């Protein structure tokens, strides 16, 4: 049958099972929005307050559901406003399809009104992108975009469509999408055998889990693997929830703000088994001193990650779930009682601690965990609150912790929380924000209110850019340049003006009461939590130092006294 390009866009989305699109209309994309209007019962459109909010919402939807997130934007500034969200998704391997519309084909390259080379701009931050200048190729291009976004290591794909292509007609035939196949043809049985041999030979193995394990859906296989290897397990920020954070074998996060147990344990192990990690600088610290006593065995779907940031001794390339299935089949149960005993001693010696009186970031995370029984979807912005959320909330399941890890995008959380809440209507979604981050995209409170989303926005408000100030305090001789936010902005009134409920709390009891009411609310709730401006994230590894040298505030005080 003959359809316009705009009709083809909508039909292709329906083919792919898309039920929600986040976006903002404009002149170039009007034909697509006009067609979307006719399919309101099949595809929900969420009008965000800003295109960046739409891209973050698509990201949060994708991370929390495992499905592709979709966002729309018009030409020019509409498209460029997506860029930060696309880059965020790219750095964290999130399957997002961004559909933009441009000026008509005859106007391309002529500096036309709202013309922008969005394909060129996003080339370094997309897994692939397309500009469609022939309507006969539109349907297959959109189908390819969805396949590329999900296959192997996921990532964002952009499809840019000139406006005249959305009006042009061509023949369209519906196609049933094929299931996305797991990457198994790259798994070499010889490599699997080598991995099994290394594990059997190890006396002090340690399992290090990243976001790849979440993406692959390998949690059950990972649990079996950890039990068979009889090894402690640490994770990255992106790996939260892949392995049960309440399990006795779990030792917490590794790296700059990792636990002392994980940092010391990895520094002492003789085999580090990396499952879906990219060995970022935030984890490695001084790369030359990282896991210096260990052989490193890496499992990853992306061959480009092998030996990229650190040299490994062996690797298995392919889908992590399938790799773990094959290794588990060939691996007998191992036993390392002395090693496990050493790790348990470290856990007892170096627990995460904080002052129990007063309102603080760690207290808020522990109380949120207690009140939600660990069953919420936690979203964060970027900064101190992000680290506290990673440290003190125990994640039992994958896709329950959403955060911008690779790019570190302030302003990510609220949009992502909207996407997560829409993708998971039966779950409680909570965005943890700093007062600096909240200012970035606080306009999306209006979106949450309009959509009647019962998400909770918890602002950890210290009236400073906390993480930047922490570095200024520790490494810049307390020169607090441009990090004080003492302008008296009333976040509660802002929330109420946008249709949400707002509370300001200054004590533990006030927070408990406000959070209890928030959990019972059917509309978004903002809780502005006033904490000490001088609170810091501990432990910490100084830049350029080995992760084994992580220190706390107490360590620093003792050093200064000596």
What are these regions (language model features)?
Residues 1-331, 371-374, 454-459, 474-477, ...:
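N-terminal alpha/beta PP-like core and its mobile active-site loop of ThDP/TPP-dependent enzymes
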Residues 24-26, 45-56, 71-78, 133-134, ...:
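Active-site nucleophile and cofactor-binding loops and adjacent substrate-binding regions
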Residues 136, 172, 197, 293-384, ...:
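Phosphate/pyrophosphate-binding active-site segments
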Residues 412, 416-454, 460:
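Catalytic phosphate/nucleotide-handling subdomain of diverse soluble enzymes
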Residues 6-10, 14-19, 27, 32-37, ...:
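Active-site diphosphate/adenylate-binding microenvironment
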Residues 114, 450-543:
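Thiamine diphosphate
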Residues 46, 181-185, 404-407, 477-486, ...:
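A short acidic, glycine-rich active-site loop
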Residues 296, 368, 380, 419, ...:
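Hydrophobic, well-ordered secondary-structure elements that form the walls
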């Amino acid at each position: 049958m003959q359809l316009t390009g705009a009709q083809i866009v909508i039909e292709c989305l329906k083919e792919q099972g898309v039920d929600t699109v986040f976006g903002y209309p404009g002149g170039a994309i009007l034909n697509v929005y006009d067609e979307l209007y006719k399919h309101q019962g099949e595809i929900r459109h969420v009008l965000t307050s800003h295109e960046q909010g739409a891209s973050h919402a698509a990201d949060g939807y994708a991370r929390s559901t495992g499905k592709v997130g979709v966002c729309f934007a018009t030409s020019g500034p509409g498209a460029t406003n997506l860029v930060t969200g696309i880059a965020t998704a790219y750095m964290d391997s999130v399957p997002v399809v961004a559909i933009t519309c441009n000026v008509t084909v005859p106007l391309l390259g002529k500096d036309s009104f709202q013309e922008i080379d969005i394909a060129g701009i996003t080339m370094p931050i997309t897994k692939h992108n397309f500009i469609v200048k022939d309507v006969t190729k539109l349907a297959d291009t959109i189908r390819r975009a969805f396949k590329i976004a999900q296959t192997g290591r996921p990532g964002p794909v952009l499809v840019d469509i000139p406006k005249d292509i959305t009006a042009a007609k061509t023949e369209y035939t519906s196609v049933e999408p094929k299931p996305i196949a797991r990457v198994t043809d790259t798994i070499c049985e010889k490599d699997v055998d080598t991995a099994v041999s290394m594990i059997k030979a190890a006396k002090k193995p340690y399992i290090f889990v990243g976001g790849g394990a979440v993406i692959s859906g390998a949690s059950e296989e990972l649990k079996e693997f950890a039990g068979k290897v009889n090894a402690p397990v640490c994770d990255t920020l992106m790996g939260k929830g892949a392995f049960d954070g309440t399990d006795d074998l779990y030792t917490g996060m590794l790296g700059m703000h990792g636990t002392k147990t994980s940092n010391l344990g990895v520094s002492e192990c003789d085999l580090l088994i990396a499952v879906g990690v990219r060995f970022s600088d935030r984890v490695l610290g001084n790369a030359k001193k990282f896991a210096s006593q260990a052989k490193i065995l890496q499992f990853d779907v992306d061959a480009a990650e092998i030996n990229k940031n650190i040299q490994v001794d062996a690797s298995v390339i392919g889908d992590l779930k399938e790799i773990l299935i094959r290794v588990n089949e060939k691996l007998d149960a191992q036993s390392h009682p002395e090693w496990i005993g050493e790790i348990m001693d470290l856990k007892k010696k170096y627990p995460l601690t904080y002052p129990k009186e007063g309102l603080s970031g760690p207290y808020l995370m522990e109380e949120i965990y207690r009140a939600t029984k660990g069953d919420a979807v936690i979203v964060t912005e970027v900064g101190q609150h992000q680290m506290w959320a990673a440290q003190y909330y125990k994640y039992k399941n994958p896709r329950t912790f959403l955060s911008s890890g690779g790019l570190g995008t302030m302003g990510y959380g609220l949009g992502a929380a909207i996407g997560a809440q829409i993708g998971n209507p039966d779950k409680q979604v909570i965005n943890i924000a700093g007062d600096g981050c909240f200012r970035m995209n606080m306009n999306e409170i209006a979106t949450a209110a309009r959509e009647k989303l019962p998400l909770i926005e918890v602002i950890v408000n210290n009236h400073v850019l906390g993480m930047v100030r922490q570095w200024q305090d520790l490494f810049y001789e307390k020169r607090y340049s441009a990090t004080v936010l003492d302008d008296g902005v009333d976040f509660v009134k802002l929330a109420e003006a946008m249709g949400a409920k707002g509370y300001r709390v200054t004590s533990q009891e006030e927070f408990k009461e406000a959070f209890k009411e928030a959990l019972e609310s059917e509309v978004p709730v903002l809780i502005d939590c006033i904490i000490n401006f001088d609170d810091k994230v501990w432990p910490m590894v100084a830049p350029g130092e080995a992760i084994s040298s992580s220190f706390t505030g107490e360590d620093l005080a003792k050093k200064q006294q000596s």
